Amino acid sequence: MLPIKRLRDWFVADALPVWLEKGYDRQNQSFHERLNFDFTPITCDGKRVLVQARQVYTYSFFANSIDGASDAAQSAFEFMYTKCRHPTGGWRHRVTREGAPLDDSRDLYDQAFAVFAGAMAYRATGREEALAVAVDTLEYIEAERAHPAGGYTELVSADGSVHEGLRRQNPHMHLFEAVLALFEVTGDDSFLQRAERLYELTRSKLIVDNTLREYFTDTLEPAPGYLGEIVEPGHHMEWVWLLHRYAKVTKTPAATVLAGTLYDFVLAYGYDARTGGLYDELTTRGELHCSHRRLWPQTEALKAHVARLEHTSDDLAEARITDGISNLFKYHLIGVPGSWREHIRQGGENFYGCYPASSLYHLAFAVGELERIGNGD
């Protein structure tokens, strides 16, 4: 029997209440970016739209699990809508604690999470305004950010100029996640068509020689030098789950095969054999590049194992879920209830100086997936 209840109980009874009590800025009806180890908020660098969007998802999804969650999610969404929108389209990167503009650049990563938040808020409340936010953001992305070489431009600076540095796979992954979510909550095929285009981009450009690359040139060739050789096991696992989800929705067997290729690479090279944790970074040849371990890749691995358990004949996936949950409690979910070790060295020593709100999204997603299969949904 999977130890799902242990993780869910920790999340619902410990983590969610802490972030609702200590991580929610009642004065400004939005969420703080980070908490100190004594759970006091860190407010010096304002608030990113990314964090508000992720917390909208988290507290919307678990609205029935804790009092006040739904209200907090809705008020954070209102804060996003009234304070974080850019006047010429899309979403600014960062605002002050009170919501005044602080960084008017528009990162594709932020735009993707604004779409996702709109989809999740619509699913939770049925409010057409939430759906409109997601649709309007997608229209901005398509009209203003389409790149001639495929995909979308990375960043529009505060002065309106398009940033011409390296391109990343990660914002495209989260946009894929967002449009899949929109299709699932609306049934509108136009969102599925966007997902199909992003799948083709990923298959043809972002996955090279059976590994998911992180950084690319303007024409979506792997970046020169070591940046083009870096791969992240956590992002591989994130894509495993997404590709299985896409395969289920679209009946695309090739997506299942691709998911298996990424999954097998991580199983072969991505785990610390001594601790059972997922490394931060490898090279494309499977060589260890960074032995540190962030919290979020461990949660994405749980989601990937769930997908393999559901959609393949992998008879070891269930054992990997059990081991992954045990590993979380051994190395990350320790200390004061509701806290975690965000980033640890190979020996398990924490070296990250706070609790970032952005990680709650990863925990929520993993718990939600585990709870879903535990309930037989």
Please give the residue ranges for each predicted region.
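Glycan-recognition and catalytic cores of secretory/periplasmic carbohydrate-active enzymes
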Residues: 1-377
